[in-house]
């Protein structure tokens, strides 16, 4: 045994020891944290999957790897563990006890949004600090007030006319109409109208706009982007992969937004103050330089475009597509709706008077039922238990615990909505509907209610009224017996709603 051999062996063992020590140093905190989460955490006695208690990666597994949506598992887990409260993460629980919705979302609630959940989000809905949220919402509120939204009806009518012309061209060419794309074009056009003081057209021809194609691609990776944002950025550098396409889509989306923003800013700086219409960009430029605190609380408009397009167009387009599917799948619902629209055809075809359209009772019932059954934002949106903790059933939750009660837990609660999986607009009409509006919660409730609620209702009411008043339509059957959807933070249909135009009743 030579001295050289001993020295070489010692050298190799030293490197082995260094590598082993490094691995242990990196892994030990994770192992210890996992042991704590499962066996010593204050939530250790809450029923639920052990893997969910161990790590938040369990939610990511369902949301992105399985691409099914973790929220779609909650009902099964509540049934499996026979409990109204389950542990869905190391520091998060979900409850089906509907009375806690009033506790969490009441006016003056001290239940703040969960920083750990929203840490990679931006924009209005992700703001945790109450002052920042109030400042930004107050800054934008006039754009989404009822009076301002009423003024958007002529713009929407013009877009609907263009869309109808395109649908008729497709019909004459023997093509089916992809309503998902038609509706996304309409809803995105409306939100861009508020974001920028420009006339941005997404509907000049029959081709789907590249901006919308890019946005759709981005939404397929939403959970990866908001959970581990650096991963897609790094993997996108690998040529030929789906992540490279993601990078290309992001570039396309960003280039359009930047170009619109720069053009808008330039025109407004060169114009008289009253010569451009109100928008996010105009309001930002109107901020006073000496109000530093307010300017700090309000993001640069370009930084919030994605959030408003996702929240202000994708959810509305999805919900409207679901409405088309359910109406056309139910002959009775379709007949009742068309009868009401025919009785008031002049306010749709001739006047396009939104103040009158919004008061049509059966149309409103159809929309409320669609919002209930389609669940546009289906997932967990955790709020933090305030100081003092809270007791849910037999379980005590300490301050700092994340608590969720999803829209699904309420919308499919049989005590509130009998036959919850059936599309029944009639449940929202007459004596049996008394008190039911309390549970029309698609836009949330309280001071954090969606700022775009009035805009969404304008689109839902006018789009459905216009198309069902004008066209006789039928589904092609591509969706089958039910719509398949997935939770990508907002709900996304896996099948586009395709239909045929049977007749144009206005010609």
Curated annotation (Swiss-Prot):
Null mutant phenotype: Causes a blockage in the conversion of clavines to D-lysergic acid. Abolishes the production of the peptide alkaloids ergotamine and ergocryptine but accumulates substantial amounts agroclavine accompanied by varying amounts of elymoclavine and chanoclavine which ranged between 10 and 20 percent of the amount of agroclavine formed. Also leads to traces of chanoclavine aldehyde.
SUPFAM superfamilies listed in its UniProt record: Cytochrome P450
CDD domains: CYP58-like
Residues the entry annotates as binding heme: 450
Enzyme Commission number, as recorded: 1.-.-.-
Localization of this protein: Membrane
Main location: membrane
Record keywords: Glycoprotein, Heme, Iron, Membrane, Metal-binding, Monooxygenase, Oxidoreductase, Transmembrane, Transmembrane helix
GO molecular function annotations of the record: heme binding; iron ion binding; monooxygenase activity; oxidoreductase activity, acting on paired donors, with incorporation or reduction of molecular oxygen
Disulfide pairings: none
The keyword Heme is assigned to this record: yes
Essential cofactor(s): heme
Gene3D superfamilies for this protein: Cytochrome P450
A GO term from the CC aspect: membrane
Bilayer topology: Single-pass membrane protein
Biological or metabolic pathway of the protein: Alkaloid biosynthesis; ergot alkaloid biosynthesis
GO biological process, one term: indole alkaloid biosynthetic process
Residues annotated as glycosylated: 247
Transmembrane segments: 15-35
UniProt key word Oxidoreductase: yes
Enzyme class, broadest EC rank: oxidoreductase
Entry similarity comment: Belongs to the cytochrome P450 family.
PANTHER family given in the database record: CYTOCHROME P450 (PTHR24305), CYTOCHROME P450 MONOOXYGENASE ASQL-RELATED (PTHR24305:SF210)
Function recorded in the entry: Cytochrome P450 monooxygenase; part of the gene cluster that mediates the biosynthesis of fungal ergot alkaloid. DmaW catalyzes the first step of ergot alkaloid biosynthesis by condensing dimethylallyl diphosphate (DMAP) and tryptophan to form 4-dimethylallyl-L-tryptophan. The second step is catalyzed by the methyltransferase easF that methylates 4-dimethylallyl-L-tryptophan in the presence of S-adenosyl-L-methionine, resulting in the formation of 4-dimethylallyl-L-abrine.
Protein name, as recorded: Cytochrome P450 monooxygenase cloA
Species this chain originates from: Claviceps purpurea (strain 20.1) (Ergot fungus)
Organism classification: Eukaryota, Fungi, Dikarya, Ascomycota, Pezizomycotina
Gene: cloA
């Amino acid at each position: 045994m030579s001295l050289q051999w001993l020295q070489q062996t010692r050298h190799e063992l030293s490197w082995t020891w260094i590598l082993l020590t490094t691995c242990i140093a990196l892994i030990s905190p994770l192992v210890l944290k996992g042991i704590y989460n499962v066996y010593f955490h204050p939530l250790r006695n809450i029923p639920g999957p052990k893997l969910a208690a161990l790590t938040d990666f369990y939610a990511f597994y369902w949301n992105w790897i399985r691409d099914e949506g973790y929220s779609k598992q909650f009902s099964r887990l509540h049934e499996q563990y026979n409990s109204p409260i389950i542990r869905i993460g190391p520091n998060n629980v979900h409850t089906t006890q509907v009375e806690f919705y009033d506790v969490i979302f009441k006016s003056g609630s001290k239940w703040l949004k969960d920083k750990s959940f929203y840490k990679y989000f931006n924009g209005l809905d992700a703001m945790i600090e109450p002052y920042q949220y109030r400042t930004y919402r107050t800054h934008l509120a006039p754009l989404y007030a009822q009076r301002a939204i009423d003024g958007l009806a002529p713009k929407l009518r013009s877009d609907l006319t263009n869309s109808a012309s395109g649908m008729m061209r497709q019909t004459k060419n023997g093509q089916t109409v992809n309503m998902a794309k038609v509706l996304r074009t309409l809803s995105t056009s409306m939100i861009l109208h508020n974001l920028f003081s420009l006339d941005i057209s997404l509907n000049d021809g029959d081709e789907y706009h590249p901006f919308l194609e890019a946005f759709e691609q981005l939404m397929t990776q939403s959970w990866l982007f908001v959970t581990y944002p650096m991963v897609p950025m790094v993997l996108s550098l690998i040529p030929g992969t789906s992540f490279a396409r993601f990078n290309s889509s992001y570039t396309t989306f960003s280039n359009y937004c930047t170009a619109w923003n720069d053009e808008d800013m330039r025109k407004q700086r060169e114009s008289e103050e009253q010569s451009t219409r109100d928008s996010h960009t105009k309001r930002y430029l109107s901020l006073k330089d000496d109000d530093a605190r307010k300017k700090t609380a309000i993001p640069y408009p370009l930084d919030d475009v994605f959030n408003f397009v996702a929240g202000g167009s994708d959810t509305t387009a999805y919900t409207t597509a679901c409405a088309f599917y359910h109406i056309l799948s139910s002959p009775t619902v379709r007949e009742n709706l068309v009868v009401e629209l025919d009785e008031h055809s002049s306010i749709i075809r001739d006047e396009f008077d939104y103040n009158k359209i919004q008061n049509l009772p059966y149309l409103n019932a159809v929309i409320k039922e669609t919002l209930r059954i389609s669940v546009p934002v289906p997932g967990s949106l955790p709020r933090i238990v305030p100081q003092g903790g809270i007791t849910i059933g037999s379980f005590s939750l300490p301050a700092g615990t994340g608590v969720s009660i999803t829209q699904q837990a309420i919308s499919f609660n049989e005590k509130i909505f009998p036959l919850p999986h059936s599309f029944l607009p009639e449940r929202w009409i007459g004596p049996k509907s008394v008190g039911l509006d309390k549970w029309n919660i698609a836009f949330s409730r309280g001071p954090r209610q969606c700022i775009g609620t009035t805009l969404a209702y304008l689109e839902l009411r006018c789009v459905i009224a216009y198309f069902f008043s004008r066209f006789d339509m039928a589904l092609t059957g591509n969706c089958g017996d039910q719509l398949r959807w997935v939770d990508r933070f907002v709900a996304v249909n896996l099948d586009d709603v395709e239909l045929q135009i049977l007749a144009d009743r206005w010609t």
